[in-house]
Amino acid sequence: MWKTWLQGGARVIFDDYKPYLRLDPQNGDLLLNEQLDREALCDLTEPCILHFQVLFENPLQFFRAELLVKDINDHTPTFLNNHMLLKISEGATLGTLFQIDSAQDLDVGKNGVQNYTISPNPHFHLKLRDSDEGRKYPELVLDQSLDREKVSEFSLTLTAVDGGSPPRSGTTLINVVVLDISDNAPEFEKPVYEVLVPESSPLDSLIIKASATDLDAGINGELSYSFSHVSRDVRKTFEIHPISGEVYLKAPLDFEIIQSYIINIQAIEGGSLSGKSSILVRVVDVNDNPPEIAMTSLTSPIPENSSPEMVVAVFSIRDQDAGDNGRTVCSIQDNLPFVLKPTFKNFYALVTEHPLDREVRNEYNITITVTDLGTPRLKTEHNITVLVSDVNDNAPIFTQTSYTLFVRENNSPALHIGSVSATDRDSGTNAQVTYSLLPPQDPHLPLTSLVSINADNGHLFALRSLDYEALQEFGFRVGAADHGSPALSSEVLVRVLVLDANDNSPFVLYPLQNGSAPCTELVPRAAEPGYLVTKVVAVDGDSGQNAWLSYQLLKATEPGLFGVWAHNGEGRTARLLSERDAAKHRLVVLVKDNGEPPRSATATLHVLLVEGFSQPYLPLTEAAPSQAQADSLTVYLVVALASVSSLFLFSVFLFVAVRLCRRSRAASMGRCSVPECPFPGHLVDVSGTGTLSQSYQYEVCLTGGSGANEFKFLKPVIPNLLSRDSEMEKAPPF
């Protein structure tokens, strides 16, 4: 368990935030960062204990511990002055005590001053006393009466010895001056003075005036005030006026360091008698220290999918003031997904309140505010920035729900035909998107030979030239996958529409332009203007406007005699025919599409003007709409063969009849074609759904050598005028 905690992160935190120790992450040993100086850390306080906490970050655990710093005898006792002057009245009684300065030793306990000795002499011996602070101080005891007339002055050597091993010692010289007799010793008003001093008191402030009285007169009644056996802290913080006994503040007070001082004072009169008193100075706390924030650990960035109550930061709060001045309140801003939780003593943990979402907010600037309860209130703010790291929790999203791309046929290979684009709300590698073509749902679609995709940017390219007439459109799916772990992906449908290009010229279906014997259209000379001679039938493999065909008479043997309708290709007579018109005519019809640029084809027509012929009447049963609309090639071929045979015989009879009766012209609405040379018969546009007018729902082609002896012509039929019960009539044979 300890190893697990160590791997999760551990640190040592002292109350004064100084890194005296560190924790070995391998074995958990506490190691010194630097050499410790007990005197600097604790001064005269004994025992010297440093309080610290061991913080384990994951999981969050606190352990309180103490470090005891043991003293070693590394300091020698020293006296404040190298020599002392002691004035003693020759009338001093035996056993009188005389105060002398004590030595100071920075060590404590047995390593501190343990004993004093004085050089051998017949007049004095030393007596040791314990002060209120636990230190030993010496006093001279008068063993033999002094006689100023015999000895007016002599010197003694005072030695201070500590209890270390080996012991250390320090010395000072005492000069004793014998004075005339003095009867009364000075006396202070109080044996102990007590005073409260705010720690914010300015320097040179009067702390207290301690006064003593002496009943003697003259020089024996003159008093001199001084400190007696005081610590170094007292001497550097306070001073006493030697004449008035006023105590002044010499250095700033700090309640957080020292809360009280004991000042031993003495009043010495001219006759060397002295009086003693003590001053207890209590330092009053003032709210002069703002709270302190020490950041112990900070985890940033944190994953966006972190569980609630994940520890983001651990910090401690300290206010060196006391009472309400040292009580604190800690807070952060509202509307943040974090909360503060007190953990141990003055430690707080900043934890997540609920899962974070980096895509909503990827950075939080948190201000930790600590306010004390003093008057006036002091506060401290500490700003931290918590970054939210990305987790791959968002799949790529395409910018469109589907894509439709247009590419014109006959494109060059590797043509850029469009792009797909997907975005990922994640960041870093989690947001890097790779595109790919997914297997098509139609197994027969050769997708890999049609298009390719750039995996990095989603650009789509046509791998080969597309042909609209072979493939008008196709669809496929594109996948977008990020680089997260695990990777997330999405897909989108892409439709590619092939746009038609005008790459096909019109193709003439009728009359055939294949180099065979041309068809000749027979037109009676009695035909009225607008008589339907023939109809050019053409198709275009393109679509749209590229397949919109228009017809134009390009050449004619006799201009103005025939015309071609631009929209349906019908060739009609433009005026009445006359005897002067040539019998044979050659027409060249231009068929042009509406593409850009337009493409065209030509059809050559041969027209033969004949003198006229009677119109056979075909029974209506053979011209019923249901029969006319049947698109059976076999049936019409049989009819055509029979008609060709009959037409041959009819032509012979017609030639005789024309000669006999030139003036009698029989109007005929039918048409036939006579070949100039043997050719196979053709049946064109007999269906009601064709491009011919509904008034001419028949076409008969004759072949040479037919054995039939009669033929029939259909009358013009208008389907919407025929009734179901129409009777059928047969044309009488010639």
From Swiss-Prot:
Glycosylated residues, chain numbering: 115, 365, 383, 514
Membrane-topology annotation of the record: Single-pass membrane protein
Gene3D superfamilies to which the protein is assigned, alphabetical: Cadherins
Membrane-spanning parts: 638-658
One Gene Ontology cellular component: plasma membrane
Keywords: Calcium, Cell adhesion, Cell membrane, Glycoprotein, Membrane, Repeat, Transmembrane, Transmembrane helix
UniProt-listed InterPro entries: Cadherin-like_dom, Cadherin-like_sf, Cadherin_C, Cadherin_CS, Cadherin_N, Protocadherin/Cadherin-CA
Main location group: membrane
Domain Cadherin: 1-79, 80-188, 189-293, 294-398, 399-508, 515-621
Domain of life: Eukaryota
GO biological process entries: cell adhesion; homophilic cell adhesion via plasma membrane adhesion molecules; nervous system development
Protein location: Cell membrane
Gene Ontology molecular function: calcium ion binding
PANTHER family the UniProt entry points to: CADHERIN-87A, PROTOCADHERIN BETA-18-RELATED
Role: Potential calcium-dependent cell-adhesion protein.
Protein name, UniProt field: Putative protocadherin beta-18
Species this chain originates from: Homo sapiens
